Structures are given as C-alpha cells and as structure tokens.
Amino acid sequence: MPSMGTYIKAISGGAILCIGGPALVMWVTPTEEEIFKRYSPELQKKALARREQTQQDFDNFTTQLKELSKSEKPIWIAQKEADSHRSETEAQAKRDERDAYAAESRRRQAEIRASSQ
C-alpha cells in the first residue's frame, strides 16, 4: 500500500494540473485589445468599420433567440419555422415588387399607345 507521502504528491500534482493549466492558458491568451493593436492600420480601420454592423447582427441574433425560446417548441424547430416564415414573407415581397413593376410597365405602354394615336 502506498504511503501517505505518495497520496499527498498525487493530490498536489493533480491540483497543480487542474488549477495551473487553466491559469496558464488565461495568462498566455492575448486580450481582444492586444490582438487589435497587432493589426495593420488598414485592418484596424476595416475592423472598426465592421464593428458596429457585427454588434448589430449579434444583437438581432440574440433578440431572435430570446423570442424563439419563449415558445413551447424546441428552439431548432421554432428557428426552422421562423426561417420558413421569413422566406415566405421575402418571396411575397419580391412577388409584390415584380407585380408592381409589371403594372407600371403596362401603364406606361398604355400611355405610349394612347399618346401615339
């Protein structure tokens, strides 16, 4: 049977690995600001220009997830239904736009025919 010293060594070694490993990763990993400072000036400008849009997209995504999580259905089913509803709405909007364009085209043709007679 191992001695008490062996148990202490094993426990202390495990503690060093379990606590020290994540601490080392946190210490070595650069922050977002440090990564941003390493960018070239043109990449910094692009990142600053996209930052607001990216933040807005993320806010929209989280808001949508919060709304979908209120339903009784699993979130992936609710997401699929919301996507299909949104695609139907977009398709209807495209059809309406196409119909309006066709009606405008017919109206112009009628005006041209009426003015040429």
Swiss-Prot record:
Source organism: Phaeosphaeria nodorum (strain SN15 / ATCC MYA-4574 / FGSC 10173) (Glume blotch fungus)
Alphabetical UniProt keywords: Chaperone, Coiled coil, Membrane, Mitochondrion, Mitochondrion inner membrane, Transmembrane, Transmembrane helix
Keyword Cell membrane: no
Transmembrane segments: 7-29
Topological category with respect to the lipid bilayer: Single-pass membrane protein
Protein name listed in UniProt: Assembly factor CBP4
One Pfam family of this chain: CBP4
Role this protein plays: Essential for the assembly of ubiquinol-cytochrome c reductase. It has a direct effect on the correct occurrence of the Rieske protein, core 4, core 5 and apocytochrome b.
Segments of skewed composition (Basic and acidic residues): 80-111
Organism superkingdom: Eukaryota
Keyword Signal: no
Subcellular location: Mitochondrion inner membrane
GO biological process terms held by the UniProt record: mitochondrial respiratory chain complex III assembly
Coiled-coil parts of chain: 45-71
Entry's Gene Ontology cellular component terms: mitochondrial inner membrane; mitochondrial membrane
Protein family membership: Belongs to the CBP4 family.
Region annotated Disordered, chain positions: 76-117
